[in-house]
Amino acid sequence: MNLVELQDVSKNFGALKVTDAVSFAVPKGQALGIIGPNGAGKSTLFNLITGNFAPDAGRVTFLGQDVTRRPAMDRVRMGVGRSFQIPQPFEGLTVYENLAVAASFGRGRSEAAVTQDCIRILEDTELLRLANTQAGALSLLDRKRLELARAMATGPELLLLDEIAGGLTEGECQALIATIKRLHAQGMTIIWIEHVLHALTAVVERLLVLDFGRVIGIGAPDAIMASKEVREIYLGIEA
């Protein structure tokens, strides 16, 4: 079963076509990585999936429902969760309080249910030891973990990760990869935009390559990275 599917989705900003008839589907439980040069349309693609942008053409389906014109908050309630490139937690709140806000926002849940979910997510993201630490005092790695945890606290069926490994040392990156691999092994469906290629290939089953808003390749990571067109466009290597 495809959890999310895009069919010929295009988005223009004035005369600029940012995504051009993009089509792909992600089955439930799969992890898809998205790569491409800066300005290729990757973040716009995320905004089309979350409902922050409406496409000028094409269709977005989630959980078998046409959500093309549904607002972002509806999609959050349906199970679309997202992290952002630059973590922006509530600096004056503790790690636990940041999660509790995300877990309870607009959902009418009991305090006991929120607490249970937050503790589980803190354990899954290795933040339980920092539950009572103010978010403003966290290291970059732990801010990234908190960004991931806040996305998980919304109860997603689909987790969108936007360059979450950026700026980390190799050791920090490996620690974050281990966390994401664990979430994926538990059944989480993931779409992950990333420039740190080895982070992606450690987790995802497929890679999609965007260039000037067009899909130029999608498939197993080894096959994609062996592609002449991908090597020339993305890696700048003549093959």
Q: Can you say where each PLM-predicted feature lies in the sequence?
A:
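Glycine-rich phosphate-binding loops of nucleotide-dependent enzymes
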Residues: 2-239
